[in-house]
Amino acid sequence: METRRALLVDAFTDEPLAGNVAGVVPAADGLTGEEMGRIAAELGASETAFVLDGEDGTDERIRYFTPTTEVDLCGHATIASYAALFAENEVDSGDRTLRTNVGDLAITVESDGTVWMRQNPPAVDVLGGGDEDDDTDSAAPLNADRLGDALGIDPAALRDIGADLPVAVASTGLPWLVVPVNFLQHLGRADPDAAAIEAISEECDVAGVYAFTFDTLEADSTLHGRAFAPAVGVDEDPVTGTASGAVGGYLRAVDAFDGEFPEELRFEQGHFLDRPGYVRVRVGAVSSGSDGASDVDLRGESAISVAIGGEAVVSMDGALRLPADGDDERGIIEA
């Protein structure tokens, strides 16, 4: 019976059982998409990364699966994969090129094991200030009342900040609906309606809703975020790399900071799930005329570079038994 090594890796943390757990299958060549989906369901992590040999000059190829579907990109599973490969001496520190469903991404592994993932140039589509109707094709307007009801947050907490920070769809490869909230007490008490969030996600063609506040638990943090993605099988994601990069691009696009944009941002997330983690985000201008220009730029620059970074630690290392050809039973985990 065929076996495959399978890891559970906690990303955006240096401690086991914190951050965001990802499944990682470090040698996934030969697996079919159906087998990858079944393995992801068996491991039960919000996303599982399947590491394949690179194509067309790239170093690696990764496919990402939730327990229910394939997704084009997953930040925390990417960080988890490279941190695990580096810890096993399967990759060296330095720069690598990763192929994903959204294109080729630049990865940097630092000598201390920190992994940086450069994402696609961000695209930001501002929908409104939280109280007026949006331009989507939804039957019900996407205003503060509807968003507040879906998130289980007092709509006043959205209106209070919406005049300065609009609701928007932001993407660096995987789109998210970005919803600012005034204070952490409101974000922390969120009681989301999964069906309502799924409906909004489908209408806006996004993976989920990322709600954030500048009111943080730690003084060093830029913001506190929560990510809800029932449309892709994840009611709440503890720490979300793709959303963090997208929100970094959003913050620059809407001029969220007075003066110079910070050199590096620190996003805290997962505390209300007892899985605290921290995403480092770098957002910078690419010189005029560079490839990949995006409509994110509201500052006269032609393109924006976004990278997310963090650490990760292996919390489980085991073997997955695959059923023989023609056997419909699911595999089981052997520690």
Model feature map: region roles:
Residues 32, 80, 219, 233-236, ...:
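Active-site environment of divalent metal-dependent phosphoester hydrolases
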Residues 65-198, 247, 252-316, 320-322:
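Acidic, low-complexity central loop/insert segments
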Residues 46-61, 196-235, 264-289, 299-307:
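Conserved phosphate-donor
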Residues 20-21, 174-176, 206-208:
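Short, surface-exposed beta-edge/turn micro-motifs
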Residues 287, 324-335:
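Non-transmembrane, aqueous-exposed alpha-helical and coiled segments at domain scale
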Residues 1-13, 55-68, 155-162, 218-235, ...:
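Short, hydrophobic/aliphatic alpha-helical segments
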